[in-house]
Amino acid sequence: MIRQPRPAKRLLHHLMALDRTDQTVQIEEIPVACPRLPAAFHGARVAVVADVHFPDALLSIPALVDCVAIQNPGAIFLPGDLTNSYTFFDEVRLAKLAKALSAIAPCYAVAGNHEMRLGREKRYGAILERNGIHYLSDSYADWTMKGETIRLFGAARKRPTPLAVDGQPSVVITHKPDRFHYYCRARWELVVCGHAHGGQMRLGEHSLYAPGQGFFPTYSGGVYTADNTVMVVSRGLGNSSIPWRVSNRPHLPVLILQPKL
């Protein structure tokens, strides 16, 4: 008589098989409308590198850098959690990644909750700055293309202050998507963030769990719009406290900026 695997064991094997297939990076091109976009930025590409979580990244540094480089980005946004507070502060890998990415395109970064939890936010920022990345902590930097400029803000405060520059779109890099209603109230036009890890396990557009949102989160990955605010949420490139990603491949969004869609 042939024994059939028990249902629980079959489910476990199925989840493990899915988990193994989820290690390849999904590169997702996302057209984004910015109505006041300067002409030099029409069609500009922005790679979003979020939630790498060294030393628990799902890709090696060369593999990740290659994925970004072939997208030919005009800029790279890093919305936090390049490190993992549950293991250790991996300064060596952080510096290597920062140096390699800054050689591709101008890079703009904020801290995530893992950097803040470690109490290493200043150290994190110093490593990034030393290796060519603009570190934004409730501050801004200018991204220039062909003589025209967009001011980029990095937001770390829980309740953001409305920010605007006359004649320019308000573009903000921050970490947490669960503050979307604050971002809308601040009238930010484009917000780029991570943190939710795609909800860990996905079934179509539905996901299981995200930090700060709990089970069945609203903002786990993709594009969200309300009023005049567009928020793009990366599903991230690494693992943290929950080691499995099921039907949830590592995610490299590439924003394609347009004046309208």
What are these regions (language model features)?
Residues 1-46:
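Acidic, histidine-bearing metal-coordination/catalytic regions of metal-dependent phosphoesterases
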Residues 15-20, 210, 240-243:
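Short, P/G- and charge-enriched loop/turn segments at secondary-structure junctions
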Residues 33-37, 62-71, 183-184:
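Short amphipathic alpha-helices and their capping/turn segments at secondary-structure boundaries
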Residues 45, 72-75, 106, 149, ...:
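Residues at the starts of beta-strands that form the adenosine-phosphate
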Residues 45-48, 76-78, 109, 172, ...:
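Residue-level marker for buried hydrophobic side chains located in beta-strands
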Residues 51:
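Conserved acidic
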Residues 54, 58-143:
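Core catalytic region of metal-dependent phosphoesterases/phosphodiesterases
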